[in-house]
Amino acid sequence: MKNIIILIINTGSSSLKFTLYEYQYQSEQILASGIIEKIKTTQAIIKIKFKNKFLELTNLNIKSHKKALKHLIKTLTNKKTKIINYLDQIQGIGHRIVHGGAKFKNSVIINQNVLNELKKISHLAPLHNPIAIKVIEEMFILFPNAKQVACFDTSWHQTMNQKAFLYATPYSWYKDYHIRKYGFHGLSYAYITKRTAIILNKNIEDLNLIILHLGNGASINAVQKGRSYDTSMGLTPLEGLVMGTRSGDIDPTIIPLMSKILKKTTKQIENILNKESGMLGISCKSNDLRDIWIESNNNEYNSKLAVEIMTYRIKKYIGSYLAALDFNIDAIIFTAGIGTSDYEIRKLSLQGFEKIGIKIDFQKNNLAIDKNTEYDISSNQSNIKILVIPTNEELTILEDTYDLIKDN
């Protein structure tokens, strides 16, 4: 198969991100990219970049994702944009799916059986999967000749051993109800592992890594022999590191206790842990680390504390994953928005590890602030490489989609 046009879709609860690519093996060109925001309102916005131009449409009445897709098609094919001439030019559609459960170990071409399986596990990601399924079903109607592919944030972690993914709860919970650690950010970790192999000139199967995906949502991944070995997020993205609005690890008895004290339902407490905790909860000001740093540098107590708690949790996870990998690693990699731009967080996260030979070059680290550039910030005296690599989850989806549809 030669050059083909592939549409990448990332469905949010009230948004639809998209990128249209012309792709040939290991060579891609972006034809258009954009987002439809504030879906389910009369103030919806479409932003799209194409051919060095930018188009923004505001105050649109887009009451559903179904209507958002129709607006997207209209935008891609209208005479003003001329991005594509007709819909059948799009031969593949790649979807980012948050949760694939234990069923989906790799990206798959979507058929009715796949849709049925996705519906069975919708309860594992109730805010994301059901909407993504509706979008897929609608796209079968709108793009009858295109192959659709599901790419899962959880698939990468399906190589974890039971000792890593099982909770110490009754085994029947796992057997009967599939309660276990699944992990997320897998599309990011897959890309970073592949990129690191190229940078270090090593075979992927020879790589042992610790990767930190630090954004508003944050997690850490231990990679052994090029495969996911353990990760900080769990059944849901709430477990693990301190994030923008998520608490990360807590004692589970906090939930019924605060439910009783605050006279709120457990669902409401869960919502607080997901949307009002983390950096926002501790700082009492913002989930944006840039705002928190401004307050912290002015000696504001809660903002300083938020940074300390966040980086302390990161250090604990790095230390535990070093031990889990028998202290045999090739590199520590920082990625995502905070990981690629915040040199202070990187420095604090690795503070103390110089005693076991993991050493940052502070000058290199301070200069590593361009989110689109790869950096080696390790000291010449470091036993391992410390890298900053921007992630590209879309490229993982694009390549998986191409690989699956090229011969079909």
UniProtKB/Swiss-Prot annotation:
SUPFAM superfamilies: Actin-like ATPase domain. InterPro entries: Ac/propionate_kinase, Aliphatic_acid_kin_short-chain, Aliphatic_acid_kinase_CS, ATPase_NBD. It is an enzyme of class 2 (transferase). Its cofactor is Mg(2+); Mn(2+). Signal peptide: none annotated. Pfam families: Acetate_kinase. The active site is at 153 (proton donor/acceptor). It is found in: Cytoplasm. Pathway: Metabolic intermediate biosynthesis; acetyl-CoA biosynthesis; acetyl-CoA from acetate: step 1/2. Gene3D superfamilies: 3.30.420.40. The keyword Chloroplast does not apply. It comes from the Bacteria. Its EC number is 2.7.2.1. GO terms for molecular function: acetate kinase activity; ATP binding; magnesium ion binding. Homodimer. Catalyzes the formation of acetyl phosphate from acetate and ATP. Can also catalyze the reverse reaction. Belongs to the acetokinase family. This is Acetate kinase. The lineage of its organism: Bacteria, Pseudomonadati, Spirochaetota, Spirochaetia, Spirochaetales.
